[in-house]
Amino acid sequence: MKREAFKMYLKPGYEAEYEKRHAAIWPELKALLSKNGVSDYSIYWDKETNILFAFQKTEGEGGSQDLGNTEIVQKWWDYMADIMEVNPDNSPVSIPLPEVFHMD
């Protein structure tokens, strides 16, 4: 199982809305992530920088960042685009973070 971390950017003033939308994550999106080996997925917010830090475990080759070709993920991106920094296709600007330490 791989561990992956990445950062994204939340627009200022949208912290509560971001949490609200994720508290009601679509069941079909959650099922897609699970079906594709994504587990132990957490997102943290740095209130000083509005950086979102995401961590997930993945089985196989892909992770949540590799599901952008699916209709449900594209709809989620569109739904979140007004409150996050996004690319032209509405995918969140996402920067992978290398692991520099791990302890079991």
UniProtKB/Swiss-Prot annotation:
Q: Which UniProt keywords apply?
A: Carbohydrate metabolism, Cytoplasm, Isomerase, Rhamnose metabolism
Binding-site residues for substrate, renumbered to this chain = Y18, Y41, W76, W77
Q: Which reaction does it catalyse?
A: alpha-L-rhamnose = beta-L-rhamnose
Annotated compartments: Cytoplasm
GO terms (BP aspect):
rhamnose catabolic process
- Which catalytic residues are annotated? H22
Question: What InterPro entries does this protein map onto?
Answer: Dimeric_a/b-barrel, L-rhamnose_mutarotase, Rham/fucose_mutarotase
Tell me the subunit arrangement.
Answer: Homodimer.
Q: What is this protein called?
A: L-rhamnose mutarotase
Recorded source organism is Bacteroides thetaiotaomicron (strain ATCC 29148 / DSM 2079 / JCM 5827 / CCUG 10774 / NCTC 10582 / VPI-5482 / E50)
Organismal lineage: Bacteria, Pseudomonadati, Bacteroidota, Bacteroidia, Bacteroidales
